[in-house]
Regions:
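Conserved beta-loop-beta/alpha segment of the NTase-like Rossmann-fold superfamily
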Residues: 62, 70-161
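Extended, small-residue-rich solenoid/repeat segments and analogous flexible loops
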Residues: 216-301
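A structural motif detector for beta-strand N-caps
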Residues: 259, 265, 270-278, 284, ...
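Catalytic-core segments of class I nucleotidyltransferases/pyrophosphorylases
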Residues: 112-114, 121, 127-134, 147-150, ...
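Phosphate- and divalent-cation-binding pockets in alpha/beta enzyme and binding domains
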Residues: 14, 60-63, 101, 125, ...
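Long terminal segments
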Residues: 341-367
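N-terminal glycine-rich phosphate-binding loop and ensuing alpha1 helix
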Residues: 1-63, 73
Length: 367
């Protein structure tokens, strides 16, 4: 079939504070890490040997996924870091450099490899992508999606000849300057020989360094225009929007956990909710061991994680409460992501608990 490579060593700075204590692939959607959906998708398509490069907060990825047997796959990890004055510090080697490190260590990439970023949700037909890659005799392929011209400035744009051979790239061009509307999705198919072009023991990037080499040497390097759901979580605003879509049921293969107690309202085990004294309008998920007090209002799409406490008269509108978040009496949160330590609005503006610059108050339900 093929092997898999999940790129998971980045710091995730654009989605802070969500990644303050988590690697980006561990950011949750419906209570599951982003990367879990990727592994499940790879397994469904028969890709069972998967390497993951890790750096920041790497233990959280490794402890959660282990050897991959829970998903019917084999997972391996390649840590990227340095020893600095007695401390081991994360130091990513770049997307291509990280793959070359694995190849130098074991020669793992001995057949076609599907390369994925660990921070996106996809439903790509992997079998069809592999077939096209192989039928063209490609050394490397980039999976692309057609995007509206007025959105090209948000993407890396791929410029091809008529038969799909890649001629050049444009990084986030203005609409009037864009030579195509084919956006790179960060999904690649590589033959082992591609990694021979990557220098050993150097920081090296796939998009900005490896791909220009392939173009300059006129190697068999193709774009595939495919039609599939690709949900990239590059910013906090993307994360909020994705959760809204998922809760509304607009994303395939994303099943709401818990028991549906009334249309559009799902609850976990051991919840304390006086249904005749609260207002809850779905779609809403309320996690296990959560308490909702009389007079509280929750308007969906909303996700209330496990162990939360929404106090009397509080209002939560189109928001996400991470686990163990407490919302005080009569406090109002609208289109926010709230954890016990911080809250962030849909545009990424962040407040930390205890700051005096806002009227908003919240806390840790365990305290």
């Amino acid at each position: 079939m093929a092997k898999g490579m999940i790129l998971a060593a980045g710091q995730g700075t654009r989605v802070r504070p969500l990644t303050r204590d988590l690697p980006k692939p561990m950011v949750p959607i419906l209570g599951k890490p982003l990367m879990e959906y990727l592994i499940e998708h790879l397994a469904r398509h028969g890709i069972k040997e998967i390497m993951v490069n890790v750096a920041f907060h790497h233990q959280k990825i490794e402890r959660y996924f282990g050897d991959g047997s829970r998903w019917g796959v084999q997972l391996g990890y390649s840590y990227e870091g340095v020893l600095d004055h007695g401390d081991i510090l994360p130091k990513p080697m770049g997307s291509a450099g990280g793959m070359r490190k694995i190849q130098d260590f074991s020669g793992f990439f001995d057949e076609t490899t599907l390369v994925l970023c660990g921070d996106a949700l996809i439903d790509l037909d992997i079998g069809a992508a592999l077939h096209e890659h192989r039928s063209k005799g490609a050394l490397a392929s980039v999976v692309t999606l057609d995007v509206p011209r007025d959105e090209v400035q948000n993407y890396g744009i791929v410029v091809t000849a008529a038969e799909g051979q890649i001629e050049s790239f444009q990084e986030k061009p203005n609409p009037e300057d864009a030579k195509s509307t084919h956006a790179s999705t960060g999904i690649y198919l590589f033959e082992p020989a591609v990694l021979d072009l990557v220098p050993s023991k150097q920081v090296y990037d796939i998009g900005s360094q490896l791909f220009p080499q392939l173009v300059a040497q006129k190697l068999p390097f193709f774009a595939q225009q495919r039609f599939f759901n690709w949900i990239d979580i590059g910013r906090v605003s993307d994360y909020w929007s994705v959760l809204q879509r998922v809760l509304r049921g607009e994303v395939a293969d994303m099943n709401m956990p818990g028991r549906e107690v009334k249309p559009g309202v799902w609850v976990g085990l051991n919840t304390s909710i006086p249904w005749d004294q609260v207002t809850i309008e779905g779609p809403v998920h309320i996690g296990s061991s959560t308490r909702i007090e009389p007079g509280a209002t929750i308007i969906g799409p909303a996700w209330i994680g496990h162990g939360c406490h929404v106090k009397a008269g509080a209002t939560v509108v189109r928001s996400v409460l991470f686990e163990y978040t407490r919302v005080p009496e009569r406090m109002h949160f609208n289109e926010m992501i709230i954890s016990p330590d911080y809250c962030v609005d849909r545009l990424g503006h962040t407040l930390y608990r205890g700051e005096d610059t806002s009227h908003l108050r919240w806390g840790d339900a365990r305290a």
